[in-house]
Amino acid sequence: MNLNILGIDFEDWYHPQLVQPFVKNLEHDPKIINGIKKIIELLQKNKTSATFFMVGELLEHDPSILDLILDNGHEIAFHTMTHSNLNELTKEKFLNELDTFDNLTDGKSKGFRAPTFSLNRNTSWVIDALLEKKYLYDSSVVPVKTQLYGFTNCQLEPFRISNSSLTRNDPNGELLEFPLMIGKFFGKTMPVSGGFYLRFLPLKTS
């Protein structure tokens, strides 16, 4: 039996890495918050539950989002406080962000996804940081190499990840990894989930 798990990266238009250099010093009024009720209505209509990987500053802006998500049977998870690439953070700063998000969510968050899927050999410390804060799973691994992120020779099904084994099951790993979905398009293997791919690929494919 195949099991599909839906994760939604809840971030605004100014959060993606490619946009940030152009809007870094500008004030932002989050617009995505206005769409949360519509998203939840669509999920209810399709009898679907989802995990919302939340950028923490959006929850700071409107704390009521938390109850809206949880009361409708969905899950909250961490996507950093400001959508910072992991390469821009230290372990200490990341731990502080985890504490902040824990306070915002009353300890409800047990999962994490790295912005821009920036988990790599240089940022593998994040696995230990998540374990220190009693997190249960990660969903940052893209099991195909792209220009910006991803891995080669990676397991496609969920596996136990560790800071020394980011792509294959580590029997001693304590954190569960849910890799992103990939598929073939015109004979080329590529990710088929995530905002860019959902916009770019035909509806039947994505």
Over which residues does each language-model region extend?
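Active-site-proximal loop/turn and secondary-structure-junction residues that shape catalytic pockets
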Residues: 10-12, 56-58, 80-84, 116-118, ...
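Conserved, mostly hydrophobic/aromatic
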Residues: 9, 43, 52, 76-79, ...
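Acidic-and-aromatic substrate-binding clefts and catalytic sites of carbohydrate-active enzymes
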Residues: 28-32, 51-63, 84-94, 115-122, ...
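Active-site-adjacent pocket scaffolds in enzyme catalytic domains
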Residues: 114-206
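Structural motif corresponding to the early beta-alpha repeats
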Residues: 74, 78-92, 110
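Active-site beta->alpha N-cap acidic-glycine motif
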Residues: 1-72, 141
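Short, well-ordered coil/turn segments that N-cap beta-strands
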Residues: 1-4, 46-50, 72-75, 106-110, ...
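CE4/NodB-like, metal-dependent polysaccharide N-deacetylase domain
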Residues: 37-45, 49, 91-123, 128-137
